[in-house]
Amino acid sequence: MATCFLLRNFCAARPALRPPGRLLREPAGAQRRSYVGGPADLHADLLRGDSFVGGRWLPTPATFPVYDPASGAKLGTVADCGVPEARAAVRAAYDAFSSWKEISVKERSSLLRKWYDLMIQNKDELAKIITAESGKPLKEAQGEILYSAFFLEWFSEEARRVYGDIIYTSAKDKRGLVLKQPVGVASIITPWNFPSAMITRKVGAALAAGCTVVVKPAEDTPYSALALAQLANQAGIPPGVYNVIPCSRTKAKEVGEVLCTDPLVSKISFTGSTATGKILLHHAANSVKRVSMELGGLAPFIVFDSANVDQAVAGAMASKFRNAGQTCVCSNRFLVQRGIHDSFVTKFAEAMKKSLRVGNGFEEGTTQGPLINEKAVEKVEKHVNDAVAKGATVVTGGKRHQSGGNFFEPTLLSNVTRDMLCITEETFGPVAPVIKFDKEEEAVAIANAADVGLAGYFYSQDPAQIWRVAEQLEVGMVGVNEGLISSVECPFGGVKQSGLGREGSKYGIDEYLEVKYVCYGGL
C-alpha cells in the first residue's frame, strides 16, 4: 500500500506520454552489473563512477565506496573529487555559460525535452539504481523517477515562458523595459533521500533559465546524478552545461566551500539539513551570492474532532512512511483532538500492521526499506528510547527490525509530550508520535512552536476551521485533508529556518533569473 502512494500521486491525471527518444540500453547483449544482495541487471552504461566535467568522464586519483543500505553490499567505487576538481568543474560551467545563455529558448526547451524523453525511456533502469543506493522500495523509486522526469518536462515548457515587461513612466519620452536574464553558474548540492528528483527540480529550472550547473550529489547516492549525466550527454546538452562532482564525506566540507565561494559561481541551491544550510549561507555571504535553500522540517499533522478518521489515517500513512519516514515534508508530530484520539490511534496501528512490510527494496511486497545508514538508525533509536523514558507508550514497533542492519520497525507512540526529542527534533525515520490536545488554539500553538516551517497537514470537515488553520500554520506548504502535497506544478519551499526561495512551479525558474531595468529615453 505505502509503496504505491508516490507512484499513484505522480501518475494521476497525467496525459499519455509523447513517443520517447532512442533507448539508451542496447536491444540485446547489453552489459550488466550485479552485486551481492542485489539484482543482477543494473545497467553498466548508467552506473558510472567517474566525475562528469565539461562533457567528459574524468577519473580521479582517489575513489570512495558506495554501499547498498539494505544488504550492506558494496555497489562500487566513485570518483572522490576535491578542491582541484571542484574548481575545474566551476570553470567548465563558466566557460559554457556564455554560449548556453545565448541559444534560443526553443532550443533549450527541445534539449530538456529530449533529456526527459530519455529518462522516461530508461525509467526502470534508473529506478533500480535509486533502490540499490538508497534502499527505498522499487515502486517508490519508480515513482521518484517519474516525478524527477516531470520536472524536466515542466521546465522545458517554462523555458519558453520567461517574459519581460514594458513600463510607461511619468515622463512621456521615456519607457522602462524589464528584462530577465540568467544569473550564471549555479552550484547544486543535493541530498540522498531523493537522489534523482532533487537534482532535476533544481537543474531543470537552472538550464531552462540559461544557467549552467555544477552538481555535488550526496555521498551516499552519487550514482543517480551520474546516470542523469549520461542521459543529459546523450540528449545533446552541450559540454559544461551539466557537471557532476561526487565526493566522500571527508572532502564534502572543502568541496562545498569551493562551490559557495568561487567567484565564478553566481547562484547556490541546496537541499539538506538546517545546520549545513547555515554553514553554506555563511560562505555565500562573503560574496553576496544568490541562494536557494530547502532545509529541515518538523511537520505537524493535526486531526480535529470533525475529521473523517479513516481519511486521516490514510493520509497519515502516506505522509509518514514514504521512504521510511526519510523525507523533509513527512509528518513528524501527530496532534489528535481528544474526541477522536483513541479511534485514530487504534486505526493507525491497524493500518501500519496491515500495510507496512519491512524488507529489501527489490523484494516483491516490500513497502518499507532500510534507513540510509547506521547513524540514521541510531538517531531513530535514541528518539524512541527518550520518549519511552519520559512516559510514552509504544503502541507498535519501537525497536530495530529483526532483519538487522539498517532496518527499523514502523513505530507508533502514544502519550507523547512536547518535551520529547521526537517532538522537538526531526526524527527522519519511521516513527509516528501522537500528542493529545483539547482545543484548536492549543494545536496551532504546538504546531507553530518550532523554528522551522516547511510543511504542515491537518484534517477537518469544518470549512471555517479549515480557513483559520490553513492561514495560521507557520509553514510554506499546507495539506488540507491530504497527506501528499508535492507536485511539479506547485511551489515547494518553507518559512522560518526551513529555507529560502521556492522550487518547482512557475516560480521555480525565477530563482535562476536576474531582473534588469532598462530606461529607454529620447522617444
UniProtKB/Swiss-Prot annotation:
Modified residues (N6-succinyllysine): K114, K123, K172, K253, K390
Keyword match Transport: no
GO molecular function terms listed in the Swiss-Prot or TrEMBL record: carboxylic acid binding; identical protein binding; NAD binding; succinate-semialdehyde dehydrogenase (NAD+) activity
Residues binding substrate: R201, R322, S486
Domain of life: Eukaryota
Tissue: Brain, pancreas, heart, liver, skeletal muscle, kidney. Lower in spleen, lung, kidney and testis.
Residues with PTM Phosphoserine: S487
Keyword set, alphabetical order: Acetylation, Disulfide bond, Mitochondrion, NAD, Oxidoreductase, Phosphoprotein, Transit peptide
EC number: 1.2.1.24
A Pfam family this chain is assigned to: Aldedh
UniProt-annotated catalytic positions: E294 (proton acceptor), C328 (nucleophile)
Chain residues that bind NAD(+): R201, K216, P217, A218, E219, G272, S273, T274, A275, T276, G277
GO biological process, one term: synaptic transmission, GABAergic
Transit peptide: 1-35
Family: Belongs to the aldehyde dehydrogenase family.
Protein name per Swiss-Prot or TrEMBL: Succinate-semialdehyde dehydrogenase, mitochondrial
Organism lineage: Eukaryota, Metazoa, Chordata, Craniata, Vertebrata
Gene that produces this protein: Aldh5a1
